[in-house]
Amino acid sequence: MSARNILVINCGSSSIKFALVNEAQATFPLQGLAECIGSPEAVIHFESAAGKESVKVPNADHQAALAQILPRVEDAAGGHLDGIGHRVVHGGEKFFASTLLNDETLAGIEANIQLAPLHNPANLSGIHAAINLFPELPQVGVFDTAFHQTMPEHAYRYAVPDVLYKDHGVRRYGFHGTSHRYVSKRAAELAGVPVDNSSWLVAHLGNGCSTCAVVNGESRDTSMGLTPLEGLVMGTRSGDVDPSLHNFLHKTLGWDLAKIDNMLNKESGLKGLSGLSNDMRTLAEARQAGHPGAVLAFEVFCYRLAKSLAAMSCALPQLDGLVFTGGIGENSSAVRERTLEHLKLFGFKLDAEANARCTRGVAGEIQAQGSPRVMVVPTNEERQIALDTLALLDA
């Protein structure tokens, strides 16, 4: 049987990230990004071995953009596409694994819109567009939240009145589940440790950041909660703040909920602390030049990350390793070094040369001799979504 091809789609409100995944190839035959969807500036960027190309598609909606993308995908797949895997942000309590998409499962995704009002409608737009364009192809939903459905109740419940959970689903769900699942399994493979007898601390650090405790291939706790705002300091998100901050800002400054929500999600984090940028690469340069805001943002980011990792360790029976992934986790040797300096009780020590070497997609162990294992493992959510899609096709 020839190697199969899966198209992976990640739809945002005004964007579509896509990748063609061939099960036998390490690199993607075609990938790209459609951005500014619905506006006169809408454009699709394609990238393949042949090079890069951008195509303007003024005012295209999700379906019109996908109609431009899919013929190129089919061509790159040699005319044979086997299925489509969709990233879906929120599966609530209904979806604890990836699932084939049909009328029933689509209704379940729609029922969770109140839990992800920005993301799930965008995900559904992409799903409906793909189904309209390729009604005969099997399509699969892969949920950011599904991996964390194995968390015990004492880890996912908030200490608020029970009725809020039972009637309104107010609980911790966690996100980045596809990345945490892929990376923890890959770490076990690289370390030669059985997945079903392993315990990992995973730090997914990008513009969004979260930690996760993974035991025997299952999530036992994670730093994000009801929404992706809970937990670590992120690019533009505050992470944990005093819940009374909303009341304080309303009474003191007269801010309404929408303004506070926008500030915490889009104006805070590294951007808010530094007054400069949400990009750790920009802050790294500014920090070297002595920019006070960049120095502060870096220090708060690393300390809060270390604090979260220490908290996640409560869910582990043992520690087989700490794993860094995501754009910052994979590329910032300085963040890794500073974070571990805050975790002295764990006995972590880095091999400076190995730490410096593991950037730009290089995986490996970076601990010094005698230290607990520390690894850098590049994430690959697109491949994990494709693997889930193939598994359901084989079921």
UniProtKB/Swiss-Prot annotation:
CDD domains, per the entry: ASKHA_NBD_AcK_PK
> What GO molecular function annotations does the UniProt record carry, in alphabetical order?
acetate kinase activity; ATP binding; magnesium ion binding
Catalysed reactions, semicolon-separated: acetate + ATP = acetyl phosphate + ADP
- List where in the cell it is found: Cytoplasm
Q: Keywords assigned by UniProt?
A: ATP-binding, Cytoplasm, Kinase, Magnesium, Metal-binding, Nucleotide-binding, Transferase
Q: Where is this site: Transition state stabilizer?
A: H176, R237
Pathway per its UniProt entry is:
Metabolic intermediate biosynthesis; acetyl-CoA biosynthesis; acetyl-CoA from acetate: step 1/2
Q: Which InterPro entries match?
A: Ac/propionate_kinase, Aliphatic_acid_kin_short-chain, Aliphatic_acid_kinase_CS, ATPase_NBD
Where Mg(2+) binds, per the record, is at: N10, E381
Q: Does the keyword ATP-binding apply?
A: yes
Query: What cofactor does this protein call for?
Result: Mg(2+); Mn(2+)
Q: Which residues form the active site?
A: D144 (proton donor/acceptor)
Q: What is its EC number?
A: 2.7.2.1
Family recorded in the similarity comment:
Belongs to the acetokinase family.
Q: How does it assemble?
A: Homodimer.
Name of the molecule in the record: Acetate kinase
